[in-house]
């Protein structure tokens, strides 16, 4: 494909790149949910190219004038260049590929490799595997084991399982109401605790970005494991005695259901109040009210990292903020699960400066990634968001750091960012090993917190 790419660069007249830009605004037939022929490409991207990609994201969409909404994407940045990788991974529509390659050439990019030749095939394989497993699975006879924690579920199944857990384990599990989404879905989670007395809290949330399916699946896996192991596994039982565990597996249910039913690669919420005729949704992890709208966020409603009309414009994030503020007196450990790349990220994101408790946070992170490596052999990189990845403002991580929560991490789960990576479409067979290693990492941090903070119950 390298030679074909070179031909694409060189065969177009010099003025052709102007026509390529014009192609951004052409309307096409076809469903927004279909990615047939879309290619995932990789290329080295310096700071100039990275900035160009961000500005181009404003016009990376194709619009339907009659329906007044986005019809499909022309390209989508899956993975940005960061401090630990110099490349970008970008998904490109088949009839926009030549134009995009030409624009890359104008930015000085000469070499492009193809990671996935047809994204729709990966999506179809994923859907087939999920449906096939659902048909074959037999009921186990009890509420805990009946929930299949090695597949991807619709949101209604997840909520029903949480409610059933509370019904069948009333002394251990309680359903907590967090918020309502733009489309009026109830966002719930569970509190898992051995006592009605408030204890230091561990909060795990997931599903902030709709297409990152493995994150809510891992949160559900951890939830099931904790309940099933209570009173049987000594280490997990102790963790339940020492801490209140709050697990909110799906913060963005509207986006998640849209990614399941319409557009598998949708990232944002589904809010409409952003001033755009066409583009819906906000990046829920750019919408928090600390250093909002600074580096690593975007003011364009069509951008995948759109910050929202104002801080906490999204009811999902406003509700989560209020829940963390008013319902949890002693929030000690907070983890937000994402994918992908296998990175364990601490504050700050908005600046390269380090927080006052940087040393303690990094010591805990070191123990967490060490526990993961010992458990599964998986390698996770750790550091601050700005130092390891790239600037990002308006995140939950920075907001809670500003509020004084001691241990705060955003975790990019499996897979690694490699040339043969599944990306957002990681097969469900990886849920269990990812859940096991994450639980070990969280336990390592909880034990560190008990030691360092000298928590007394």
Predicted regions and their residues:
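M14 metallocarboxypeptidase catalytic domain recognition
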Residues: 13-457
């Amino acid at each position: 494909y390298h030679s074909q790419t070179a031909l694409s660069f060189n065969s177009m007249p010099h003025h052709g790149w102007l026509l390529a830009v014009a192609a951004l605004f052409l309307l096409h037939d076809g469903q927004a949910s279909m990615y047939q022929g879309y290619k995932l490409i990789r290329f080295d991207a310096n700071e100039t190219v990275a900035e160009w990609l961000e500005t181009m994201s404003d016009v990376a969409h194709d619009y339907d004038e009659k329906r007044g909404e986005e019809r499909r994407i022309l390209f989508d940045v899956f993975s940005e260049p960061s401090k630990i990788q110099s490349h970008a991974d970008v998904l490109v529509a088949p009839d926009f590929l030549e134009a995009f390659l030409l624009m890359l050439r104008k930015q000085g990019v000469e070499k492009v490799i193809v990671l996935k030749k047809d994204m729709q095939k990966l999506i179809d394989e994923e859907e087939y595997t999920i449906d096939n497993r659902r048909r074959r699975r037999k009921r186990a006879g009890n509420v805990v084991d009946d929930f299949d924690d090695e597949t991807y579920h619709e949101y209604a199944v997840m909520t029903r399982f949480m409610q059933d857990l509370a019904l069948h384990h009333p002394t251990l599990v309680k359903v907590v109401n967090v918020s309502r989404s733009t489309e009026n879905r109830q966002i719930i989670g569970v509190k898992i605790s051995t006592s009605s007395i408030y204890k230091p809290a561990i909060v795990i949330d997931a599903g902030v970005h709709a297409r990152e399916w493995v994150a809510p699946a891992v949160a559900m896996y951890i939830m099931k494991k904790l309940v099933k192991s209570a009173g049987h596994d000594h280490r997990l039982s102790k963790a339940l005695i020492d801490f209140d565990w709050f697990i909110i597996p799906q913060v963005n249910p509207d986006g998640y259901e849209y990614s399941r039913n319409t557009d598998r690669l949708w990232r944002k919420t589904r809010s409409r109040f952003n001033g755009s005729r066409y583009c819906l949704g906000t990046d829920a992890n750019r919408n928090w009210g600390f250093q909002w709208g600074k580096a690593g966020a975007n003011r364009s409603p069509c951008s995948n990292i759109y910050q929202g009309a104002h801080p906490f414009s999204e009811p999902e994030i406003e509700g989560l903020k209020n829940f963390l503020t008013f319902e949890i007196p002693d929030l000690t450990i907070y983890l937000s699960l994402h994918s992908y790349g296998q990175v364990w990220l601490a504050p700050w994101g908005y600046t390269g400066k380090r927080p006052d408790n940087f040393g303690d946070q990094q010591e805990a992170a070191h123990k967490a990634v060490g526990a993961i490596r010992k458990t599964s052999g998986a390698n996770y990189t750790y550091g601050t968001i700005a130092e390891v990845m790239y600037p990002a403002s308006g995140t939950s991580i920075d907001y809670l750091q500003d509020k004084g929560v001691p241990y705060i991490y955003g975790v990019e789960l499996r897979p690694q960012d490699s040339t043969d990576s599944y990306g957002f479409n990681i097969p469900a067979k990886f849920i269990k090993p990812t859940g096991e290693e994450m639980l070990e990492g969280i336990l390592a941090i909880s034990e560190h917190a008990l030691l360092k903070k000298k928590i007394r119950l």
